[in-house]
């Protein structure tokens, strides 16, 4: 048996008036996901426990079978693993966003989805100007970067994700608590370095949002995972554009497969991800394919972009992998789901349960579900499940 887990990050949503009070999944054309739901078993999964923030880190750990109550230590350490940044026992890793500020507010949590090439120049400049014995900057992908603080600095600082406070006054949400003043001052110092940087002057000339500040959040120590093979007896691989998912894969002992042109946005290399997934399954039991674009569109509050992202995920990821599975000599089990909702109306993550469907190519089932969306799956036989149990269900199905 081969297994494919297909994640459309943030696909789930609330009913939208402009779509006739339908959700994005209800309004989008998604024949491949609908087929999986109609011929498999469906239900709702709780990916984020009530006591945890509704982040992609917590949600995707859960989906991969790692209970956050046991394994979660923060988002940034997972990203550090993907970036090849080793953490000492007293190192605290922080996500460092490049953001756009205007009139004392966070205008754009992604600095206009700045390119990785531009961002690397800015992060290298910040590291040159602001690094100390206890603070180092590391470039990542697009707006997503890393700060490593030594000597337990910032471990207890209270931080807010910037995508939760777009349009809000910065002063209300600066880091607070122990070491909060230090990191607030670091944010202010970054503005001096970035404001007149040639990269940003050019972006302004081109009508793009400048990356004129950093924002720190998501900190934590290096976690300790039990290997996926030891827990579930399967050899697997992770395919994603974002360091967070790659880091989870690394800590889980899964192979992380790089795909050229995978951007974490609408312009990602869908076909490259499919080719990589099919190739990975020739020598592995399981592949975990993650697409970030629906989440980014949700954060932007764009109905049009989210519809496109969901339809592209269905037609360019789910459909070809489903076709491959159904024509394979080996039986396949496919799990399709978002990790969490990123509703257009709130532009950030929520912890509402998400729809999922499981389909076995050698054992089609009728589950009284005809479409893949938040409402239809409520008629499924699976009911409401804890997401960290899904891998076990998948393997035993």
Curated annotation (Swiss-Prot):
Gene Ontology biological process terms, A to Z: glycolytic process
Reaction(s) this enzyme catalyzes, per UniProt: (2R)-2-phosphoglycerate = (2R)-3-phosphoglycerate
GO molecular function term, any single one: metal ion binding
InterPro entries xrefs: Alkaline_phosphatase_core_sf, ApgAM_prokaryotes, Metalloenzyme, Pglycerate_mutase_ApgM, Pglycerate_mutase_ApgM_sf
Record keywords: Glycolysis, Isomerase
Pathway in which the depicted protein is active: Carbohydrate degradation; glycolysis; pyruvate from D-glyceraldehyde 3-phosphate: step 3/5
This enzyme's EC code(s): 5.4.2.12
Keyword hit for Nucleus: no
Main EC class the enzyme belongs to: isomerase
Top-level taxon: Archaea
Entry similarity comment: Belongs to the BPG-independent phosphoglycerate mutase family. A-PGAM subfamily.
Function statement: Catalyzes the interconversion of 2-phosphoglycerate and 3-phosphoglycerate.
Name of the protein in question: 2,3-bisphosphoglycerate-independent phosphoglycerate mutase
Protein source organism: Methanosarcina mazei (strain ATCC BAA-159 / DSM 3647 / Goe1 / Go1 / JCM 11833 / OCM 88) (Methanosarcina frisia)
The encoding gene: apgM
């Amino acid at each position: 048996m081969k297994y494919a887990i297909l994640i459309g990050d943030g696909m789930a949503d609330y009913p939208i008036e402009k779509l006739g009070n339908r959700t994005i999944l209800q309004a989008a054309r998604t024949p491949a996901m609908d087929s999986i739901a109609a011929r498999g078993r469906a239900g709702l999964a709780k990916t984020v426990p009530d006591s945890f923030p509704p982040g992609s880190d917590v949600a995707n750990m859960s989906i991969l079978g790692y209970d956050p109550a046991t394994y979660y230590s923060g988002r940034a350490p997972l990203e550090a693993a993907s970036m090849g940044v080793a953490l000492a026992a007293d190192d605290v890793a922080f996500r460092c966003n490049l953001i756009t500020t205007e009139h004392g507010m966070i205008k754009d949590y992604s600095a206009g989805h700045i390119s990785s090439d531009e961002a690397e120049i800015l992060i290298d400049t910040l590291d040159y100007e602001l690094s100390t014995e206890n603070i180092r900057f590391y470039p990542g992908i697009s707006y997503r970067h890393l700060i490593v603080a030594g000597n337990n600095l910032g471990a207890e600082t209270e931080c807010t994700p910037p995508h939760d406070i777009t349009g809000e006054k910065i002063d209300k949400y600066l880091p607070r608590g122990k070491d909060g003043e230090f990191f607030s001052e670091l944010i202010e110092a970054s503005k001096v370095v970035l404001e007149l940087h040639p990269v940003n002057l050019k972006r302004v000339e081109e009508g793009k949002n400048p990356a004129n500040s950093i924002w720190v959040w998501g900190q934590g120590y290096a976690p300790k995972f039990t290997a996926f093979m030891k827990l579930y007896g399967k050899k697997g691989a992770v395919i994603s554009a974002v360091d967070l998912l790659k880091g989870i894969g690394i800590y889980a002992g899964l192979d992380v497969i790089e795909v050229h042109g995978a951007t974490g946005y609408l312009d990602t290399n869908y076909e490259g991800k499919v080719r990589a997934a099919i190739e990975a399954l020739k020598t592995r039991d399981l592949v975990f394919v993650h697409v970030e674009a629906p989440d980014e569109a949700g954060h932007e509050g764009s109905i049009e972009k989210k519809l496109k992202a969901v339809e592209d995920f269905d037609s360019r990821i789910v459909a070809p992998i489903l076709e491959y599975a159904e024509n394979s000599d080996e039986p396949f089990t496919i799990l399709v789901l978002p990790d969490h909702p990123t509703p257009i109306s709130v532009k950030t993550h929520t912890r509402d349960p998400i729809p999922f469907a499981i389909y076995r190519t050698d054992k089609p089932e009728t589950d009284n579900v005809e479409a893949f969306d938040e409402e239809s799956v409520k008629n499924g036989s699976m009911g409401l499940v804890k997401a960290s149990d899904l891998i076990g269900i998948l393997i035993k199905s």
